[in-house]
Every structure is written in structure tokens, then in C-alpha cells.
Amino acid sequence: MLRERTVRLQYGSRVEAVYVLGTYLWTDVYSAAPAGAQTFSLKHSEHVWVEVVRDGEAEEVATNGKQRWLLSPSTTLRVTMSQASTEASSDKVTVNYYDEEGSIPIDQAGLFLTAIEISLDVDADRDGVVEKNNPKKASWTWGPEGQGAILLVNCDRETPWLPKEDCRDEKVYSKEDLKDMSQMILRTKGPDRLPAGYEIVLYISMSDSDKVGVFYVENPFFGQRYIHILGRRKLYHVVKYTGGSAELLFFVEGLCFPDEGFSGLVSIHVSLLEYMAQDIPLTPIFTDTVIFRIAPWIMTPNILPPVSVFVCCMKDNYLFLKEVKNLVEKTNCELKVCFQYLNRGDRWIQDEIEFGYIEAPHKGFPVVLDSPRDGNLKDFPVKELLGPDFGYVTREPLFESVTSLDSFGNLEVSPPVTVNGKTYPLGRILIGSSFPLSGGRRMTKVVRDFLKAQQVQAPVELYSDWLTVGHVDEFMSFVPIPGTKKFLLLMASTSACYKLFREKQKDGHGEAIMFKGLGGMSSKRITINKILSNESLVQENLYFQRCLDWNRDILKKELGLTEQDIIDLPALFKMDEDHRARAFFPNMVNMIVLDKDLGIPKPFGPQVEEECCLEMHVRGLLEPLGLECTFIDDISAYHKFLGEVHCGTNVRRKPFTFKWWHMVP
């Protein structure tokens, strides 16, 4: 901010200047002196404070003008004022010049001042209230003691008949829309009018013009008008000076999220401009600046309480839908069914969208991230989710091809973790990628850049390209430990499956049949003995376990986990024609987590004493922790199409109680 400026005096004339409270005026009395002048004296008004500065030493000046000072090239005056003027040019500083012997001034110079107060204010201390002239308002710092205002992307839709998000136009249709915006106040105080030629201007830079918008509310006789004054094509706005003590209220909206090449910081400035002469540009004599950070999009991990469970209604999933409904009824959340007219035959609701939220001190709301997958569910997030206090954002590649890894079964987030002393209070984003140097499939760069730019959930890339579908939710999930703030990582494990089957074979259950009661599948009599004797299947799953262990090591390193934090769930895979893995039986780790209630794919494992040994094993691992296991039959409606329970459902969860601005990325 411009807090000091120079005013040039001229002997024998009167110079008028507008002074802004909180700044300094400097003037060179030596250069303004008439020929022959040797000393000078000063007089000033009651509310003006003047210092004579010589060789870096300052001396306060009394108001009566009796004291004399020698003129020298190093002598300057520093002028400040204590309060706003009541009339234009009513405060003054008079410099009297004297020759070597005279007691009567040979000439004088006058500085006539109009003091005004200008302050552009925001909620820099993040308490939900716009305070006055916070000294930290022009900077932004992270942490619990941090300072700096916060802005929401206005990505919801308050008016149902509009086709797009509120931030996509330059209009405000209701007061509800203003509540999504951050308030900014321009406070002024001074005489009824300013000297001729002065202007107060709000402005933004060209680089910020597509990232922030500002509205002003007028109150004409016939109701309020919401006027768009800054953003997009509008870079500046002249503010009418009203005189006296005034507060002009503005509403600021974010237009886009942090992303590659955009840190999330935007600046808004107010300047006082001075008129010199016709055809001469106005000169800024004072500038005040505020900085906002646009709130990041934040994902919610499994440990947070569920709000809504989403599932698609298909021609072939009636029983699955019924079982999911029964599971949801055990919790405090609601079931939302996406019917066929909207899903158009697309059952993979997990792959189409990811729920998250944005938050500022004054407000927060959920925001859905729409994947570039764009299956037949592509209209669902805009038609059914986007609305009042429910935002929407998407990222689509311009030139890259979209692969299965761009579906959001390949996008998860861990619970809060601490890694080598570094805390991630909102967890870390987890995405699947290709094996290093393999040149395989990878999530498109535009989505990866977006996730990284949010800063608060630093992404970790895992290796998922070894799977046919290639999603991280095929080999991992997080579950809470009820009654604590702790969690466990569940990982698919082929070695755990072979170990369990060998134990059952040793106990005399080698002829136990898998897929019992499933018609054609059970007629093949797939037994424990056949699985253990299938050498090619054994070798394939040794390779798949190496892929799982690669991810296990990454997760332990990047999330600060130990073996005690991980539970292995039995899984088997078979290799497809591209040498990638698909589940041999329903993959139990691909579950839905609703607090302590887990909806787990029913594995149809070997029947030992008329019970599925896989279900018994998993219950024995999880239920002693306080978790409740419900096994859901998804084999015909999802498993045979290479997905499971998690792939066919989606959960919106409550936001973190932790405020993202309190962390240090």
C-alpha cells in the first residue's frame, strides 16, 4: 500500500492537497525557498502534526510559529493529521521564509489540506465480521493465528430456472445469492465534498478479472438493485464520494477454484486519484488493498458421518437396492435413488461424481466434482444436485483421452494423518496411476492439477493400472474405529485368501464349494481344493499381491501408517487378456462405510458348516472393533460388470469440524 507521498511547495503560492489518514506527507522546504532565504518557521492547524526532519532526526513542531530552523538541503517536513476534515482545505501548514537578519518573512508557502479517511475492509481475522482497517488485510497467512479474508466460489444455483451456476453470469436474482459472497466495506469519512478533480476508484488486475466478481447493492425508491461492478470485462469502478461518515457495502464472489497457474489469491484495490489538468492522466495518491483466498474444494473421508446415500435404480438391481435401503435405515442418513429416466442405464454413480464441500467463516456448502467420464449419468449432477447451497465443479481435458482411471472410483481420500511430524488434518487425496515407467493409464492431467492446487489434501499417486478397471477402491478402504478418532486401512490381499483357504483345507474342508446357490456358477463346483491346485491362478495372484504390496508400501510411507494400522481382507483376482486383474469373487474391500455399519459385497465363499468362511473371517476381523458387517448380494447386478457395492453407491458426508485455514500446507 502507498502510505507515504511527496507534496511540492512553491513560495508565494498556495498548494492544495488531500491527505488520507494513516499516511505521511513529505515536503522539501529547501527546494521551495525563495532566493536569499536562510531560515524558516512553521505554523499549522490544531489537527495537523508536523515534524522537521534533518539528517534523519525528527523534531516535533509547535503550532505558534515562533521557532526557527536553518534551511539546508537535508531538511524536510513530515506531515500527518489526527482526524478527518469537516470542510475542504480547512487545515493548513504555513512556511515562513526569512533572510539572514530579518525578523519579517520575505515570503511564505502554504499547504492547504483536506483530510479524509479511506479504508477498504474485509473479514481479515476470519471471525465472520468485517472489521475496520485490519493491518493484515493486504496479506494472507495459513494457520490458527493466520490472517486474510476468504472467498467462496459461487458455484451453486439459487434460482432453479437458470441452467448454470451463479458464478457463470453477472447477475444477482435474490438476497440468498448474496449470502454465498464475502462482504467488503469501503469506509470513508471527510467533508461534504472533496476539492475538484479527485476520484475514488475500485479496481482489479486483468489477471484476476476472470477469478473474482464484485456487486454493489443500490436502494432506489422501488426496491433493491444488484449492480455488477467488477469482474470479467470490468476492471474498475468509480465510487461516488458521499461526504461525512459513510460505509459502502460490496459483495464479492469467487469465479473459479485454485488450479494450475492460479494459487487462489486475488486482490482488490481502492485508489484515490488526483486531477492535474485536462488531457493529463489522473494520478494515484493513495491505494488500499485487500487480499482474498478462494476456498479450496475439500473431499470427505469414510470416517465422517454420512448425510445421504445415492444409488441407481436399474432393471436388474431390485434386490441390491432393497438391501442397501435396509442398511441405510440402520443409520441416521437418507437414501436417494437415481431412477432410470435419469441414469439412462448407467449404474456406476461412484464413478461419475465425488462429493466435497467448500467453507468460509461466514458460510459453507457441499460441492460435487463431476468426473470427465461423462457416462449416461452425466446429466445427474447438474439436474439433481446443483441447486441452492449445493455447488458444482468439473474439469474436462481438452486434448487428453479419457480412460477408466478418470472415473472417481479412482479418487479417494484418507482420514487425517501425521507423517514424519507433518500433519494433514484433512487427510490426503489418493488417486490410482500407472506403474512408474510403464507408460500405462493415468488420471488426466487437468484433474490431477485441480486436486493438487487445492493444497489442503496433498495428493498421493498409487498404482492401480494393474487392475482391469484400474480404481483404487478395488484394493483399499478406510473404516473408523467406533468411539475413537482412529481408523484402520483395509486392503485386499490375495495372500490372506490363500492362507485362509489352506487352513480350511487342512481342517478337512477342501471340498467346500464356492458360489453355492448361484446356478451356473455353483454347478462348476469351484472348491477350495480346485483353487489351491490351479497353479496358473496361484502364480497370477502372487503377481497381484506384489502389486498390492507396492501400494501398501506407498500408503505406509505417505500416510505414516504401520502394519498395526492395516487389516488384510481376503481377495482373489484372475488375469484378463490384457494381463490385468479382475475380481474372482465379489471384492469385499469395495464396501460402503456408514459410521460403524459396513455394506460389504457378499463374497459367496466356500461353505464351511453351512456358513461362508470368507464372511466368518471378515466378521472376526472387524466386529470385535465395534463395526457391524452387512453382506450385500451384488454379484449379478454389479460384480459381473466388474464392480461392487462401493462402485454402485455414493455417499455425501458431513464436512470436517476442522477449519481448513487453520492448517499449514
UniProtKB/Swiss-Prot annotation:
GO cellular component: azurophil granule lumen; cytoplasm; cytosol; euchromatin; extracellular exosome; extracellular region; nucleus
Pfam families: PAD, PAD_M, PAD_N
Tissue spec. comment: Detected in keratinocytes in epidermis (at protein level).
Free-text cofactor note: Binding of Ca(2+) triggers a conformation change that is essential for catalytic activity.
Subcellular location: Cytoplasm
GO molecular function terms listed in the Swiss-Prot or TrEMBL record: calcium ion binding; histone arginine deiminase activity; histone H3R26 arginine deiminase activity; nuclear estrogen receptor binding; protein homodimerization activity; protein-arginine deiminase activity
Name of the top EC class for this enzyme: hydrolase
Classification via SUPFAM superfamilies: Cupredoxins, Pentein, Peptidylarginine deiminase Pad4, middle domain
InterPro entries according to UniProt: Cupredoxin (IPR008972), PAD (IPR004303), PAD_C (IPR013530), PAD_central_sf (IPR036556), PAD_N (IPR013732), PAD_N_sf (IPR038685), Prot_Arg_deaminase_cen_dom (IPR013733)
Reactions catalysed according to its record: L-arginyl-[protein] + H2O = L-citrullyl-[protein] + NH4(+)
Phenotype upon changing residue 647 to A: Loss of enzyme activity
EC number: 3.5.3.15
Effect of residue 123 to N: Mildly reduced enzyme activity
Oligomeric and partner information: Homodimer.
Primary role: Catalyzes the deimination of arginine residues of proteins.
Protein name stated in the entry: Protein-arginine deiminase type-2
